[in-house]
Structure formats: C-alpha cells, structure tokens
C-alpha cells in the first residue's frame, strides 16, 4: 500500500461513506482497478481502519448532538425523571439499532472479509438496493422526526443495516431507506443513520487496527494518510448530504448507482478487472 493508493482510497472512503452509494463498493472497485487483490488481509484491514477517519468526521460534525444524547443517557441511568426524556431514549435507540450489525459483523466476519468481496456481489447490491431506495421514497409518509422514534423503529432500522454488510447495498442507503419506511422525514432518517454509524464503524475500525498494523504491506504512514484524507472528505460529504436531503429525493442517487453497476459488469466481462 503506497502513499498514492492510501490517498485515493482515503478520499473515496470519505466521499462515499455517508452517501447512499456504498463506500465498500467504491473501495472494492478502486482496489480492483489498481490491481489489488480485494480479499487480501492487507487490503481488507486497511479499508476497515480508514473508516475511522470518516467516523471521526461524523463525531466532530455531530458533537453537540452526541454530547446532548450521551449526557441525557447517563442522567437517565441515575435519575428516574430523566429516563423517558427524548434524548435519553435516543441513546437507547442507537444502542438497540447497533446490536444487530454488531452481532452479524462479528459472527460473519470471515464471510464478510472474503466471500462477499466479489465484484459480482457489488453489482447485485448496487442494483437491488436501488430498487429498495425507489420503493422507500415513493411509499414513505415522511411525517415523523427523531422525537417520534420508538424502540421497534430503531430495531427495524438496525436489522436493515445488517444488509449493508453486502458490498453495494450501502449502509447509509439501507438505514435512511428503512427510516423513510418507518415514516421519518429524510433529514431525521439521515441524522439517525449518522448516529447509528458511529458505534458500528468505530468498533469495526478498532477491531481491525491491531491486525492492520501487523499486516505485511500496510504501514502506519499509509494508515495515517488514508484516515486523514477520509476525515477531511467525509466532513464535507456529511455537510453536503444534510443540505441535499432537505430538498431532494434519494432517488437522485439511483441512476448513479445503476451506472456504476453497468460499468463494473462491463469491466468484468471485458477482463479489465477480476471479480476478486
């Protein structure tokens, strides 16, 4: 993993992590185009660790929201009158929504790292979840905000988030679509998607960090560069997406997703890239 590769992958991670286009799909495609073996330990560990840059960007961007929720959650542990406050409950909902992907990610880590790294899975995920995004947008009521959230909503969104372990689905695409299906408006669904991303991706990055540092082909310098680039570009991406969803439908991303899928199929069938 050289410096140029680290910069390129870091930028791709940051730009795409929170957009409903699948960062894993874009990273896998970029790795294949650069001649990397997409299921190699060095590659999978590197991409997992640089996610921490994107997550740090989310933490910085939503620092006031996070401080409010965490403070209310801890107060709710010791004060009965705080336990039912909207912010304390939101803390519990983030925890509940994180549990499904935490269990699935840990129990299925070998399948995720190897069996699901094929570009054909990327194509399937991009196309099939594009249909789900269109369906969610066209059938959603979009009348609720985060203060209307209940435990079944959080669990449902968390379960749908598990599908994002398949490259091409998109974690944000899955969770925002699920939020829309539960009747939340786009901004509320997107904000909860960001909050839900923080514990899940931070845990994945920390879990992979020790392996990445000790893996041949991954230097600490490349990890720092990739993570730094992911942070900078993710911060800008978050700010842009929140403004975008306030006035535009997620279906605007569908044509892009389908175009990427068509490109990957063409690249695979012509031998430009290999599936794994």
Swiss-Prot record:
It is found in: Cell membrane. It is a multi-pass membrane protein. One of its GO terms (biological process) is cell wall organization. Keywords: Antibiotic resistance, Cell membrane, Cell shape, Cell wall biogenesis/degradation, Hydrolase, Membrane, Peptidoglycan synthesis, Transmembrane, Transmembrane helix. This is Undecaprenyl-diphosphatase. It catalyses: di-trans,octa-cis-undecaprenyl diphosphate + H2O = di-trans,octa-cis-undecaprenyl phosphate + phosphate + H(+). HAMAP family: Undec_diphosphatase. Bacitracin is thought to be involved in the inhibition of peptidoglycan synthesis by sequestering undecaprenyl diphosphate, thereby reducing the pool of lipid carrier available. GO terms for cellular component: plasma membrane. It holds the Pfam family BacA. The lineage of its organism: Bacteria, Bacillati, Actinomycetota, Actinomycetes, Acidothermales. Belongs to the UppP family. The chain crosses the membrane at residues 42-62, 88-108, 116-136, 149-169, 187-207, 222-242, 253-273. Its EC number is 3.6.1.27. InterPro entries: UppP. The keyword Hydrolase applies. It comes from the Bacteria. Catalyzes the dephosphorylation of undecaprenyl diphosphate (UPP). Confers resistance to bacitracin. One of its GO terms (molecular function) is undecaprenyl-diphosphatase activity.
């Amino acid at each position: 993993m050289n410096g140029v590769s680290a910069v390129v992958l870091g930028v791709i991670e940051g730009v795409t992590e929170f957009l409903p286009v699948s960062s894993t799909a874009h990273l896998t495609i970029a790795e294949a185009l650069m001649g990397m073996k997409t299921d190699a330990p060095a590659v999978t560990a590197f991409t997992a660790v640089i996610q921490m840059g994107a997550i740090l960007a989310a933490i910085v961007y939503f620092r006031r929201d996070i401080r409010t929720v965490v403070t209310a959650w801890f107060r709710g542990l010791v004060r009965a009158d705080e336990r039912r406050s909207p912010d304390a409950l939101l803390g519990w909902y983030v925890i509940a929504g994180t549990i499904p992907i935490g269990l699935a990610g840990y129990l299925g880590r070998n399948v995720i790292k190897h069996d699901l790294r094929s570009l054909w899975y990327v194509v399937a995920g991009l196309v099939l979840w594009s249909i789900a995004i269109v369906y969610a947008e066209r059938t959603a009521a979009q009348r609720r905000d985060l203060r209307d959230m209940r435990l079944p909503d959080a669990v449902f969104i968390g379960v749908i988030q598990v599908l994002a372990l398949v490259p091409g689905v998109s974690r944000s695409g899955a969770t925002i679509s699920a939020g829309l299906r539960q009747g939340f408006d786009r901004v509320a669904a997107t904000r909860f998607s960001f909050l839900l991303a923080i514990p899940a991706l931070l845990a994945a990055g920390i879990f992979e960090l020790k392996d990445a540092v000790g893996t041949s082909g991954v230097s600490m310098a490349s990890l720092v560069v990739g993570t730094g680039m992911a942070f900078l570009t993710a911060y800008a991406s978050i700010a842009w997406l929140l403004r975008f969803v306030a006035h535009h439908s997620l279906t605007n991303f569908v044509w892009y997703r389908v175009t990427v899928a068509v490109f990957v199929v063409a690249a695979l069938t012509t031998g430009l890239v290999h599936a794994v």
